[in-house]
Design a protein with these regions (language model features):
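PAPS-dependent sulfotransferases, especially Golgi type II membrane carbohydrate sulfotransferases
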Residues: 1-38, 210-327
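Walker A (P-loop) phosphate-binding loop of P-loop NTPases
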Residues: 51
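PAPS-dependent sulfation machinery
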Residues: 76-173
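Short catalytic-loop micro-motif centered on adjacent basic/acidic residues
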Residues: 171-175, 268-270
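Conserved phosphate-donor/acceptor-positioning beta-strand/loop module used by diverse small-molecule
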Residues: 175-177, 186-211
């Protein structure tokens, strides 16, 4: 994405340059760590549109302690995540603690975020640099799945996930929304997986996405998030209809992609239902993982509910944009 971000959201070019250097240095080590076996654990892929509650869901999954996940620390090793996983355990895992030398690494994962960005070494990260390392997308964040199989190094992609799970000895949960339009690609690569489609009331989803544009880019006229296949047509509409169409088409793509996915590998989570009764989502996911051959040996022990933000939208422009796509 090439949009000009406001100062608090701008990339740190010095950091990115140094990370590229470090990851290049580590690659020869990483290459020797790539396993040849299939993943020993299932993956949990979080799908759906922007501002649908996906960050809350990934933070919640992280807080269960039952899943490994890309952290802000691990994300810095996007070309060497197996090595990064080992380093993370060394620095932050209580098993390797010595007189609290590095205790500040072990801060609990909060439920705070800003436009999907979290704070803290062990907070969930969206892992987009890792995904983009493999995905040969251009101006539009999409290619037909047949082209992905031709161009993506799928052997290394699968091996990286397999190796990370070997290190953590847990399933991995993470956002995979960059592949909302290529669920069949992931489904074919990972025999053991659960796809969670995050959905939200469209009106509040539209309002939240518009606010994210304003917060990160300075106004609502600039496109925010992945450029989906419908971007050329949507970009000609007013901002409210752009966002309404963006959310409509992403949800449609995910629904169509999941249509051919086996029942035990998919579930839909509505943000409002999740906030009202997260334990029900935990139980459903537990059953899906069991059907994938993995039993979560734990009972639910987190919050009974979360506060729902933006429970009513009255802005006539948002309502009109919603009707243009949803009827």
């Amino acid at each position: 994405m090439t949009e000009k971000r406001l100062q608090p959201f701008q990339r740190n070019k010095s950091l990115e340059s140094f990370l590229a250097e470090v990851n290049a240095d580590l690659w020869h080590v990483e290459e020797s760590l790539l396993p040849a076996h299939k993943p020993a654990f299932p993956l949990v892929f979080v799908m759906g549109p922007l501002r649908s509650g996906s960050t809350l869901l990934t933070q919640w999954l992280a807080n269960t302690g039952l899943f490994a996940y890309p952290t802000n620390l691990l994300s810095r090793f996007y070309r060497a995540p197996i090595m990064g996983a080992k380093l993370q355990l060394l620095l932050a895992d209580e098993r390797y603690n010595f007189r609290d030398e590095l205790k500040d690494f072990g801060q609990p994962v909060s439920f705070d975020s800003e436009n999907g960005k979290t704070k803290g070494a062990l907070a969930p990260n969206e892992f987009w640099y890792f995904w983009r390392r493999f995905l040969p997308f251009g101006d539009i964040d999409y290619l037909p799945t047949s082209e992905l199989f031709d161009q993506v190094n799928t052997k290394t992609l699968v091996a990286e996930f397999s190796g990370m799970m070997d290190v953590f000895n847990k399933p991995i949960s993470l956002k995979a929304m960059i592949l909302n339009y290529n669920i069949d690609f992931l489904d074919a690569l990972f025999e053991k997986a659960v796809f969670i489609h995050c959905k939200r009331d469209p009106l509040t989803n539209i309002e939240s996405a518009l606010n994210a544009r304003k917060r990160q880019l300075g106004d609502i006229d600039k496109w925010y998030s992945f450029k989906i296949p419908e971007y050329p047509e949507l970009s000609r509409l007013d901002p409210h209809e752009q966002v309404a169409g963006q959310i409509f088409h992403v949800n449609k793509a995910v629904e169509e992609g999941l249509r051919n996915v086996a029942e035990h590998k998919k579930m839909t989570v509505r943000y409002e239902d999740f906030c009202d009764h997260p334990e029900a989502v935990f139980d459903q996911l537990k059953n899906k993982l069991s059907a994938n051959g993995y039993d979560l040996d734990a009972e639910y022990c987190l919050a009974e509910r979360f506060n729902v933000t933006r429970d009513k939208v009255t802005d006539p422009k948002i309502v009109s944009a919603y009707r243009a796509f949803y009827g």
